[in-house]
Amino acid sequence: MDENKKTEGLNLQPQALEAEEAVLGSMMIDEDAANKAVSILGSSHHFYKDSHKKIFEAMLVLMNNSDPIDTVSVSDELKKSKHLKSVGGIYYLTGLVDKVPTSARVETYAEIVKEKGMLRDLIITSHEISKKALDAGDSVGSILDEAEQSIFSLTEQKDSKIYQHIEPISVSYTHLTLPTSYPV
């Protein structure tokens, strides 16, 4: 069978698996990179690959508990949630770290992951709008209002950053601070 005929009609969703891997690897080698990635992505929603979603979710659990994020702790958290094997095991996690020589570009990679996730959301939203327009059960004004709300919520997502409470973050920087009478 001709290769073109095999893939004809196959619509691949927008994705950047290399950027996803770079984000996850960067998060395991640098705590600041982990904070930056989480502030951009917020949740695992923007990841395309399910195993990457699970790894990111394990990292979020570790961050929320103020635990370090590295291959050992992520592996342990994935074991607890019974996802270690399904994500590829400890070898996959160490492979993610090995693929990233530095975490310096984590923000760029996280933005790419977020952008691809938003494109997938836009495709889903536009498909839902098309279905409503074809059904024509509602008035045109109602369909336009819903379409506008859906698109607006995607637009808000574009510029949103996730903010974290200062206390868990400040714990890792206590060695750099001066004691004062002000509470943390």
Regions found by a protein language model. Give the residues of each.
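Conserved small/polar residues in nucleotide/adenosyl-binding loops
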Residues: 174-180
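A general boundary/transition motif marking the beginning of the first structured unit of a protein
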Residues: 11, 15, 25, 135, ...
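Noncatalytic partner-interaction/assembly domains of nucleic-acid and motor enzyme complexes
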Residues: 1-117
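Amphipathic alpha-helical
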Residues: 157-173
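Residues within well-formed alpha-helices
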Residues: 36, 57, 125, 146-149, ...
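Extended, charged alpha-helical coiled-coil/arm scaffolds that mediate oligomerization and mechanical coupling
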Residues: 90-156, 160
